[in-house]
Structure formats: structure tokens, C-alpha cells
UniProtKB/Swiss-Prot annotation:
Chain positions recorded as GTP binding sites: 117-124, 163-167, 217-220
Molecular-function GO terms, alphabetical: GTP binding; GTPase activity; translation initiation factor activity
Region listing for G3, in residue ranges: 163-166
Gene this protein is translated from: infB
Species classification: Bacteria, Thermotogati, Deinococcota, Deinococci, Deinococcales
Name recorded for this polypeptide: Translation initiation factor IF-2
InterPro entries with a match to the protein in the record: EF-G-like_DII, IF2_II, IF2_N, P-loop_NTPase, Small_GTP-bd, T_Tr_GTP-bd_dom, TF_IF2_bacterial-like, TIF_IF2
Positions of the tr-type G domain: 108-281
């Protein structure tokens, strides 16, 4: 034996990979990952260290029996703390007073894996092969395609694959604050190498900060060139292990099954190093993978259990929606009564279809669920108001970070040709300075997509377009998510925009612009919102979150913000001249006869 892989040695010696890496660090042996090889001399040293470690344990085995007795006095403290925690419990199920277990006492959970890549590179074929060979016969009939995820059995344990196509679905989940996947598999065809969607998939995985494994598919084809793929990956600063980097690259064939066993092994090894754990006895939390309406059953939602255990009969809260679980189905299509961590289940019981990526929590009962939803609705309205205010007050420092620090400008680039993309990247590289870093999260050919908007919204990036324009749906989505899309057909104008972002030579200048005027004709007392000014708009228009000035006679008695507008019982954004409305100010001393003037801060276009 001249050389051996680290994970193979760990398996032979019955040692966890993490412990093996600790020993190698102590010996000063360099390695890239657990798939790196080590010399026979190093193997002998490791065996010697492990033998020495096991010897003292045998000698000291007698006094260990005292540990339980020593731990007993702590029990009354745990019991006494329980009532206090019960009183502090909120409507959504939260941790109870039992002492939190140490990290090493929390059991490991199965890794959750998503597979992404360019169309026709074999993502679906690879999933189908794994499903066919690693899932029980009763599960392999296509049922799992409706559940949105499936479980594969390996020698190392269970692996959960998310069966939701497309990296945009993956980013949709992350955009709502949930990281459902632990590992991302990037599938690249050996005869095609890197394609636009491949680069996008890699960018999305990097933005999510999840470990990546590259599966070079279709190696069975005569024209397959895996080495070209590895070389092309280095252009994205992704260096395969064979080239001295730390990127795991596995040649596979979804057609013949070649390399699939190795891929599953690497997934298990990566999961072990990530030390994935979840407490099945803790409070429940999960994520919506997908939701749909079934003609016969009604609303169905696929939930990935992340913490705790889900039971039939539990009340679940998702955003401003709730439901009681009437039935649960596992990835095999069988009815189950409970599901623990890293288990995908299809849930029947919601009245509305929940959105992908929404976080799920359990509630004690229906009343508690309704209370949570009401509170969340209030929070949402406050956030909408704050977001609208920020749109008129956003400064260069908000975009780039505090002055005096190294600031990062996140960008998504879109252009009409590859040559234009490369030219823009070259220009941006020369624009970086000591105090400013330019991070091009994604550069591609063609008009910006909804996936670009999702990526930009999660990373607070600006989308710059050269000679391409976004579609109406993409523009609307960007407006809703507060993402700036700027399109140019002259390269120098785009460069000027980059200069404004980087150097800050031109900071935004705002001026106050008159909107409208209203008379207060009655004051409406509201238990939650305080006093609302029942008013008639005599001139111009009123807009929610606009600035407000209240005058009484010749005296200005209030200056602030319009926090809400109502027409009858409906919340509205605008009210025009000649209409009555309720104006909610962050102020309760409004009186009948007062005059309210509305204005807004508008950015002045500069030469």
C-alpha cells in the first residue's frame, strides 16, 4: 500500500472523518479534503496515535461509572426551571424549559441535497437513476415526483434529494430566508462543458454558501472530455482537487451508473464534515418545498422537517396562513403519523397554497395560530411602510456600506454578446480600489431573468444591462423586491454609472415636492391605530408614507409621516382630489379643521 484516501482509511479504522483530519492537522500533514491521499508512513503514524488513545481509556474505565451519580443533583434544577419557561412560551411552539442538550448529544440528521445545472445536461436522468437504484421498489413508480423530494438509502445512511427543478426554485426558497439544502450538486455534461445555466447555478450555490460537488455527467459518450470541464471550472476560480484545489469533481454516467456510487459516497463524506444535527425532541420548524391544489384532495404542501417532529393533528403556521394537519404522506406515498428531521412530507390541511421557501412553525391550537397570523400581518404592514420610506431616503452609504470601510458593490451583469460581457468584466476589474471591492455575482448573455432578480434581492445587488432590456414581468418583480435594473446602450454611460457607484462622486440630491392638501372634517378614534383624520382632499393627491405637515390656523403643529391611508375600511396607497379618506399620522393630537399638506422627497436628476 503506497497511498490511501483519507476517508477510506477512516472507514477501515472505524474513525469519523473529522477526527482523522484532526490527527492529520496535528501531524502537520497537508490535505485538501477527505478524498486526498496520504503516504503509508502517515498511515502507520495515525494507527499508532489511535492505539495510544485507546489504551488510557481501558485503564480509566472504572471511575467513569461515577458520572451518572455526579450528574443527579442537576435534575432538580432542570425540573424547577420548567414552570418559568412554560409561562414564557409564545403562541408559536418554542423550546420548553428542559435543558438544551450538548451539541454532541444532538443526533445527526440526513443531508438534504439539491441538483442544479444546464438544461439537457442530465439532472433529471441522474435523479431518476438514483431513485431507481436507491429507493425501494414501491417508491420508484413516480410517486416521489409529486412529493417534491425523495429519500435514497446508502451504506452511510439516508440522503434526501429535493426533486424541484431549476436553480430559480432553489433561489426562491433562499430569498425568503430559508436554506433548505445542505449540499448542491452541479451537473455538467462531459461533452458540453460550462453553459450559461451552469454558471448561473454555480452563482446561486455560491450565494447560498452551501458546499458544492460537481458531477461531470455523460462520461460514457465517445466525445466526452472531462478534463476540458475541469479546466473550464478553473476560469471560475473553482479548482478541482486533482489540480490542487478543494472542489470535489466526480465523473458519472446517469445512463450506465458509472461513478454514481462515488457521488453518493462524497455526499455522505461532505455531510459528515458539515456535522449536520437536529433534535427530534425539540420544537418543530420546517420549510415549504412546494404547494399546489389537487382537484380531489385540495391544498397540498410539501414540507421539509428541519427541527423537531411533525405530527398529524398539529396546527401549522406559514406566513399569514395556517392549517391543521389532516393527513401526512411520505416520499413513498404512504400515510404516516409523524415525521422527524430531514424528512420530506406532503401535508393536507392548509386552506391556501403556501409559497415555496416559506418557513413553517407549529402552534399550540387554532386560537394561537390566529394570534400569530394577526401579529405577522401587523409586522408586514410596518415593514411595507418602512420599505416605502427607505426608497426615498436611500443613500450611497446604504448601498455600499459605512464610509471608511472596504465597501463591496454587488452586481449582476447582462449583455447582448459574450464579447460585451467579457469587456464589462475587464472594465470592472480595473475599477476596483483599496476601499472598494466589486463582486460580480453573475454575468450572462441575454435579458435579465426573474432568477437574476431573486439573486439580486438576496444579495442587495444592482443589475446592469448592456444592449438588453428586461421584460415587463421582470421589471415588475424588480420593483416589488426593491431591485435596481439599469439598462444602457452606450458603454460609456454604463461606465459612468459604475463610477457613481464606486467612487461616490455624485451623491443623490433630494428636494421636497408638494403633493396635495386636505381638510380634516372629523376625527375617528381607533383602538389600535389611534386618532385617524377623516379628511377631504381639496388639491393634488395624498400618498402613503409621504411627508405630512399639519397647520392649525397659521401655526404648524405637526411634521411627520403619513403612516396609513384608508378609503372606508380598505388600506390604499393613494387618494386623489375630490375624495374623502382617513389619514393616519404618527400623532394623536389632530383636530377637526386642521389642514394637512402632503409632500415627498424626490431625487433630482443631475447633469
Amino acid at each position: 500500500m503506497s497511498k490511501v484516501r483519507i476517508y477510506t482509511l477512516a472507514k477501515d479504522l472505524g474513525v469519523e472523518n473529522a477526527r482523522m483530519l484532526e490527527i492529520l492537522d496535528g501531524l502537520g500533514v497537508a490535505y485538501k479534503s477527505v478524498s486526498s491521499t496520504i503516504e503509508e508512513e502517515t498511515v502507520d503514524l495515525i494507527k499508532q496515535i489511535l492505539e495510544e488513545e485507546s489504551a488510557p481509556q481501558a485503564q480509566d474505565s472504572t471511575p467513569v461509572a461515577e458520572t451518572p451519580a455526579a450528574a443527579q443533583p442537576a435534575a432538580p434544577q432542570a425540573a424547577s426551571s420548567q414552570p418559568a419557561a412554560a409561562q414564557a412560551a409564545q403562541a408559536v411552539a418554542e423550546p420548553v424549559a428542559a435543558p438544551e442538550p450538548a451539541v454532541n448529544e444532538i443526533p445527526h440528521r440526513a443531508p438534504v441535497v439539491t441538483i442544479m445545472g444546464h438544461v439537457d445536461h442530465g439532472k433529471t436522468s441522474l435523479l431518476d437513476y438514483i431513485r431507481k437504484t436507491r429507493v425501494a421498489a414501491k417508491e420508484a413508480g413516480g410517486i416521489t415526483q409529486h412529493v417534491g423530494a425523495f429519500e435514497a438509502k446508502t451504506s452511510k445512511g439516508k440522503i434526501v434529494f429535493i426533486d424541484t427543478p431549476g436553480h430559480e426554485a432553489f433561489t426562491t426558497i433562499r430569498a425568503r430566508g430559508a436554506n433548505v439544502a445542505d449540499i448542491a450538486i452541479i451537473v455538467i455534461a462531459a461533452d458540453d462543458s460550462l453553459m450559461p445555466q451552469t454558471r448561473e447555478a454555480i452563482a446561486h450555490a455560491q450565494a447560498a454558501k452551501v458546499p458544492m460537488i460537481v458531477a461531470i455527467n455523460k462520461v460514457d459518450l465517445p466525445q466526452a472530455d472531462p478534463e476540458r470541464v475541469k479546466t473550464d471550472l478553473t476560469q471560475l476560480n473553482l479548482v478541482p482537487e486533482e489540480y490542487g484545489g478543494d472542489l470535489i469533481v466526480v465523473p458519472v454516467s446517469a445512463k450506465t451508473g458509472e461513478g454514481v456510487e462515488d457521488l453518493l459516497e462524497y455526499i455522505s463524506l461532505t455531510a459528515e464534515l458539515e456535522d449536520l444535527r437536529a433534535d427530534p425532541k425539540g420544537p418543530f420548524s420546517g420549510v415549504i418545498i412546494e404547494g399546489k391544489v389537487d382537484r380531489q384532495a385540495g391544498v397540498l404542501a410539501t414540507v421539509m422537517v428541519q427541527e423537531g417532529t411533525l405530527h398529524v393533528g398539529d396546527f401549522l403556521v406559514v406566513g399569514e396562513n395556517y392549517g391543521k394537519i389532516k393527513a401526512m404522506t411520505d416520499s413513498a406515498g404512504g400515510r404516516i403519523k409523524e415525521a422527524g428531521p430531514s424528512t420530506p412530507v406532503q401535508v393536507l390541511g392548509f386552506s391556501e397554497v403556501p409559497a415555496s421557501g416559506e418557513k413553517v412553525q407549529s402552534a399550540k391550537n387554532e386560537h394561537a395560530a390566529r394570534d400569530v397570523i394577526a401579529a405577522r400581518a401587523d409586522v408586514r404592514r410596518d415593514q411595507e411602510n418602512a420599505r416605502d420610506r427607505r426608497k426615498t431616503q436611500r443613500t450611497l452609504e446604504d448601498i455600499m456600506g459605512p464610509i471608511g470601510e472596504v465597501r463591496t458593490v454587488n452586481l449582476v451583469l447582462r449583455a447582448d454578446t459574450q464579447g460585451s460581457v467579457e469587456a464589462l468584466q475587464g472594465i470592472l476589474a480595473r475599477k476596483e480600489g483599496e476601499d472598494v471591492k466589486i463582486n460580480v455575482m453573475l454575468a450572462g448573455i441575454g435579458a435579465p431573468t426573474e432568477g437574476d432578480v431573486l439573486l439580486a434581492s438576496t444579495a442587495e445587488a444592482t443589475i446592469l444591462c448592456f444592449s438588453v432590456t428586461p421584460s415587463g414581468s421582470v421589471t415588475k418583480m424588480a420593483e416589488n423586491k426593491g431591485v435596481d435594473i439599469k439598462s444602457y446602450r452606450i458603454i460609456y454611460e454604463l461606465i459612468d454609472e459604475v463610477d457613481r457607484l464606486i467612487k461616490g462622486n455624485v451623491e443623490p440630491v433630494f428636494e421636497e415636492r408638494y403633493l396635495g392638501r386636505a381638510e380634516v372634517r372629523m376625527v375617528i378614534r381607533h383602538p389600535k391605530s389611534g386618532n385617524i383624520a377623516g379628511s377631504y382632499v381639496t388639491d393634488g393627491m395624498f400618498r402613503r408614507n409621504a411627508k405630512a405637515k399639519v397647520t392649525r390656523g397659521k401655526q404648524t403643529v405637526y411634521e411627520g409621516t403619513i403612516v396609513g391611508l384608508k378609503r372606508f375600511k380598505d388600506d390604499v396607497r393613494e387618494v386623489q382630489t375630490g375624495y374623502e379618506c382617513g389619514i393616519n399620522l404618527d400623532w394623536n393630537d389632530v383636530m377637526e379643521g386642521d389642514i394637512i399638506e402632503a409632500s415627498e422627497m424626490v431625487e433630482v436628476e443631475q447633469a
